[in-house]
């Protein structure tokens, strides 16, 4: 009776008593292992799996862990310049001896399943990776929890900000000044003074003053600091009234008219 089994990505035709080398198994010398991937059973009755034969198994003993043969690569050249060197990778293998072939009941034998050492390494790596990911996630959650109380004072400071804004708004409102009481809807007797005489006042600025009720020099000369601040802010003069001494100029021009 023979069987075709699969291990390490390769297929082997075996029968009881055979010794063969297979891809490295995760087993020690002297251990008994069982191969459960059976593709075909032969003998008096041939059974072909679809793709595996259900319940079939091949049992074997591990003799030793070995390496592949050393290969010598020989390069022949002319005039005694030939060379040779050891070449290639020495694959790690497991030498086993087939002890029995089971046509059925292999899934209930209780014998250790033959697993490739590479599969064990991959599984161990996956477990280690999962552990690292879990540790990082736990640390991240802990850090977030520790930082949560620190974020609370910032929120309180943000709530306190409107009070400060209100406190700053009060002086700003005070700096806007008081609207002059002598602003007019139209020039007296329909004749406005020539405000362009004031330094820095042109036709455009004169028109702007007229639109805001300023037509005469005596209106400007009567303004106090509060009224000056109001008109300066209203007309966006940026301190021009005080900088160009409008009050003194208006006083002089008003005196000339008298």
Curated annotation (Swiss-Prot):
<keyword id="KW-0694">RNA-binding</keyword>
<protein>
    <recommendedName>
        <fullName>Large ribosomal subunit protein bL21</fullName>
    </recommendedName>
</protein>
<dbReference type="InterPro" id="IPR028909">
    <property type="entry name" value="bL21-like"/>
</dbReference>
<dbReference type="InterPro" id="IPR036164">
    <property type="entry name" value="bL21-like_sf"/>
</dbReference>
<dbReference type="GO" id="GO:0006412">
    <property type="term" value="P:translation"/>
</dbReference>
<keyword id="KW-0689">Ribosomal protein</keyword>
<comment type="function">
    <text>This protein binds to 23S rRNA in the presence of protein L20.</text>
</comment>
<dbReference type="GO" id="GO:0003735">
    <property type="term" value="F:structural constituent of ribosome"/>
</dbReference>
<dbReference type="GO" id="GO:0005840">
    <property type="term" value="C:ribosome"/>
</dbReference>
<feature type="compositionally biased region" description="Basic and acidic residues">
    <location>
        <begin position="140"/>
        <end position="159"/>
    </location>
</feature>
<comment type="subunit">
    <text>Part of the 50S ribosomal subunit. Contacts protein L20.</text>
</comment>
<dbReference type="GO" id="GO:0005737">
    <property type="term" value="C:cytoplasm"/>
</dbReference>
<dbReference type="InterPro" id="IPR001787">
    <property type="entry name" value="Ribosomal_bL21"/>
</dbReference>
<dbReference type="GO" id="GO:1990904">
    <property type="term" value="C:ribonucleoprotein complex"/>
</dbReference>
<keyword id="KW-0699">rRNA-binding</keyword>
<keyword id="KW-0687">Ribonucleoprotein</keyword>
<dbReference type="Pfam" id="PF00829">
    <property type="entry name" value="Ribosomal_L21p"/>
</dbReference>
<feature type="region of interest" description="Disordered">
    <location>
        <begin position="140"/>
        <end position="181"/>
    </location>
</feature>
<dbReference type="GO" id="GO:0019843">
    <property type="term" value="F:rRNA binding"/>
</dbReference>
<comment type="similarity">
    <text>Belongs to the bacterial ribosomal protein bL21 family.</text>
</comment>
């Amino acid at each position: 009776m023979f069987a075709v089994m699969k291990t390490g990505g390769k297929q082997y035709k075996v029968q009881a008593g055979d010794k063969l080398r297979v891809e490295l198994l995760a087993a020690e010398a002297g251990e008994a292992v069982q191969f459960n991937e059976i593709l075909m059973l032969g003998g008096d009755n041939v059974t072909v799996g679809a793709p595996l034969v259900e319940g079939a198994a091949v049992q074997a003993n591990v003799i030793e862990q070995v390496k592949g043969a050393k290969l010598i690569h020989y390069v022949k050249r002319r005039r005694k310049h030939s060379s040779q060197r050891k070449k290639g990778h020495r694959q790690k293998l497991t030498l086993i001896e087939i002890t029995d072939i089971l046509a059925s009941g292999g899934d209930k034998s209780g014998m250790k399943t033959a697993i490739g050492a590479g599969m064990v390494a991959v599984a161990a790596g996956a477990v280690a990776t999962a552990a690292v990911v879990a540790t990082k996630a736990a640390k991240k959650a802990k850090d977030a929890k520790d930082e949560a109380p620190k974020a609370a004072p910032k929120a309180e400071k943000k709530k306190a900000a409107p009070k400060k804004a209100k406190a700053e708004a009060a002086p700003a409102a005070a700096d806007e000044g008081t609207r002059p009481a002598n602003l007019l809807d139209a020039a007296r007797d329909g004749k406005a003074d020539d405000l362009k005489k004031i330094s820095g006042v042109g036709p455009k600025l004169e028109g702007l003053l007229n639109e805001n009720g300023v037509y005469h020099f005596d209106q400007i000369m009567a303004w106090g600091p509060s009224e000056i601040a109001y008109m300066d802010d209203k007309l966006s003069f940026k301190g021009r009234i005080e900088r160009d001494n409008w009050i003194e100029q208006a006083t002089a021009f008003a005196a000339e008219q008298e």
